Amino acid sequence: MTTSDRLVALVRDTSSALPEDVLKAIAAARRRERRGSSAAAVLDTVLENCALARAKGVPLCQDTGTLTFFVDRALRGRVTPALIRRAVARATALGYLRRNCIDPVDGRSYDDNCAEGAPVIHYVDPGDVPGLPPRGVALIMKGGGSENMSRQYSLPDAGLGAGRDLAGVKACILDAVKRALGYGCAPGILGVAVGGDRATGFETAKAQLLRPLDEKPRAGDARERALAKLEREVLREANALGIGPMGLGGATTLLGVKIAARPRVPASFFVTVAYMCWACRRRVITL
């Protein structure tokens, strides 16, 4: 199989099959909901949809989203932007992706999903992106509904009563959950960046969505333990809101929360929330 074939298969598999950790989390959420409830019905439909999409090799959501590739920079000579775009164009022609790329100026559709800046491609060092192995290529497909629910805050925030500390960070994250309600296709998954600038905040937050929901608890220094504690607190408090699947009420509003911190300058303190819907389409391959 050629590198191009591997990339086409990566797009196909990411589009049609959720990672096992996400499927397990959805199934666990279903068991927590009351039989006969709207929440249970929603999650039953989600699980049935996932099974059918995987079996037939078709997109599990009609919005095949923005494609973001993270590529080990050691592969740059082999996995070029042109090669990735050709693979995306082939995947589109084969029906693995919807024609989902529109020019914001004249409204025309890029029928192969390829244009300047589309798909999004980052060449990175593996250690800088969660779960990316040496010689790895990772893909996230993030739909527009969930992208619309992503937010960025600047602390202090007088409206939230949020200061420049982890309590203020938590207030921002929970506000994002409340404002999303069911519009982001809950139950969602949050990738969060604390610090950085406005651009790196969103890049870092989205990269956290590559982290498995069932990863081992963080160890490390006091800083890492503080972030792990914050993840647990946000997950617990968000699920206590009762927003539930699709905003129809229930015990599961979020499936997971993944938080990273980046250095900031004295004048700025950003909290960036990348909201991902239940269809957390991500996959990593090694070439």
What is each PLM-predicted segment?
Residues 1-192, 197-287:
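Non-transmembrane, aqueous-exposed alpha-helical and coiled segments at domain scale
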